[in-house]
Amino acid sequence: QTVMLRHSHRFSGPIGELALAVNAGKPDLARACFAGDSGGQLAWSVPAQQEDVLRLALRGRADAPGGYQPYLALVHAGEAAYAQHDDWVRAVLHAFESFRILCAVREGEWGVAGLNTAIELRLEKDGLIRRSEWYVGRPVMVTRNDYGTGVFNGDIGLTLRDPARP
């Protein structure tokens, strides 16, 4: 089964306002996005060590618990509780979208690559994933536009089991 992304939500709401401020090079406006986010969708965190980020990824914040655990719980519970496979897929995607760690740089211990690796290793250590190249629940990011399918650079999807192949 193929699931197609039809609408990008990457730059809407508070995260969209933050992205515009950052891309425009307006740090004061970016900081104001955090102060003005009454829905609690954004949180500013300056961790002292990488372990703090790993705890955040596993459990979320005190005022917004969860981290990646709710999404992974849905992945592992499977679709049995849902009338349709597509309903389960939407629930998993929604749960995944409810938590993000954004990095200012790509490389290094504090960059996207370093934190993604550290988070995956911790999730595996805690039994939340079975890490391999294509483990169930693995996030994937599109790295170039494909106008034919409507999938664009930066869009995110998840690897899930094919219901036709249990």
Question: What positions do the PLM features span?
Answer:
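Conserved helicase motor core of P-loop NTPases
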Residues: 1-140, 146-148
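Short beta-strand-centered aromatic/proline hotspots
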Residues: 152-163
